[in-house]
Design a protein with these regions (language model features):
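Hydrophobic alpha-helical interaction segments
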Residues: 99-107, 115
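Compact, glycine/acidic-enriched structural inserts
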Residues: 59-100
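A surface-exposed partner-binding patch
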Residues: 1-65, 91-92, 98, 116-162
Length: 162
C-alpha cells in the first residue's frame, strides 16, 4: 500500500501553487538537517521529513523570524495536507511559529483574498484525489505540536554550529 506522500507525488501537481515546489537542484543551507528528506520548497524554506520522527513534517527556514530554524508543522503528512487545504498553501502554516492568533487570522484573510482559480483547483484536486479534508483550527494544532516538541533527533552539519 502506497503512503499518502507517495500518492501525492504521483499526482504531479504544480506544487508552486501551494508553496510546495519540487526542486531538482537543492542548495543546502546551513540549517537543513543532515537527516532530512525534502518534500518540497517555498524559496529557501524546505519542508521535509526528519528520520527519527517518522511521518512528521517540518519546516527548515534559514531566514526565520523565530528563534529556531527547524520546527514541526504536522504530526503526519496527512495532517500536513489537511493544513494546506485549510490554509491554502504552506506559507501561513510555516509562519505560525512566530505569529499570534490574530496575526495568523489576518494573514489567512490576505492569502484568501489573492488566491487564484488555479490554486483553488489544485486544492480541490488534492482534497478529492487524496480523500482528505481541511484540518480544523490550524493555528491551535501547530502551536500545540510545537509547544511539546523534542528536537534532540535533529542532526545538523558542522556548518550549523559555526
Amino acid at each position: 500500500m502506497k503512503t499518502l506522500f507517495e500518492r501525492y507525488k504521483k499526482l504531479n501537481i504544480n506544487g508552486s501553487l501551494i508553496c510546495l515546489e519540487q526542486v531538482e537542484d537543492i542548495y543546502s543551507y546551513f540549517c537543513y538537517p543532515t537527516n532530512a528528506k525534502a518534500i518540497g520548497f517555498e524559496g529557501s524554506i524546505m519542508y521535509c521529513f526528519i528520520e527519527p520522527y517518522g511521518d512528521m513534517v517540518f519546516a527548515c527556514n534559514p531566514d526565520t523570524c523565530a528563534d529556531v530554524f527547524v520546527y514541526p508543522l504536522a504530526k503526519t503528512f496527512e495532517d500536513f495536507m489537511g493544513l494546506i487545504l485549510a490554509c491554502g498553501s504552506t506559507n501561513p502554516i510555516e509562519q505560525i511559529v512566530w505569529m499570534n492568533k490574530e496575526q495568523f487570522a489576518k494573514h489567512l484573510q490576505g492569502e484568501e483574498a489573492v488566491r487564484t482559480e488555479e490554486q483553488r483547483a489544485v486544492l480541490n484536486h488534492l482534497e478529492k484525489k487524496l480523500g482528505i479534508s481541511p484540518l480544523d483550527n490550524p493555528y491551535d494544532y501547530v502551536k500545540e505540536l510545537q509547544s511539546h516538541f523534542d528536537n534532540s533527533g535533529i542532526e545538523y552539519s558542522d556548518e550549523y554550529y559555526d
